[in-house]
Amino acid sequence: MKIAIHNSRGSFSDRWIAYCDSKGVEYKLVDCYKDSIIQDLTDCDGLMWHFHQNSPRAILFAKQLLFSLEQSGMKVFPDFNTVWHFDDKVGQKYLLEAIGAPLVPTWIFYSKKEAISWAGETSYPKVFKLRGGAGSQNVRLVKNYSQARRLIRKAFNRGFAAYDPPGSLK
């Protein structure tokens, strides 16, 4: 058995490499971002890739590669059932509703008009969250309709920066 490991210093791959070395497990270091990644994996039985939720590049690509490889029969970590809802509050909401888990009342909007209408009728304060973001990142306490309307317009127009340095210090 030979495991491919996406080598990313300072991530879980450091521990995976050390483990393989200590246990005599054969592995190969790969770069999942290379166009030749599929070819690079032909002599491997599995792929391990810990991608970071704050990397827009990884978020756009990792799930597609891992799912494609899994569909071809390759063992991957994380697998589709582990990763599809990772750092995805919308996916998590629907999953929790589908299994009947207790859930804080949650509203998701796909149109600005519907969101602004809801904001005009709801009570405050409300917690606004973007789809992604760990910890308190992309979370705002909204105290009134005016503040809500401003955030809704921003969300449906130019959007929010992927990384908010001051917000990450909260």
Predicted regions and their residues:
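Extreme N-terminal starter segment of soluble prokaryotic enzymes
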Residues: M1-A4
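Conserved N-proximal alpha/beta basic substrate-recognition cap immediately N-terminal to
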Residues: N7-Y110, I116
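Active-site nucleotide/adenylate-binding loops and adjacent lid/helix of ATP-dependent enzymes
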Residues: V83-K170
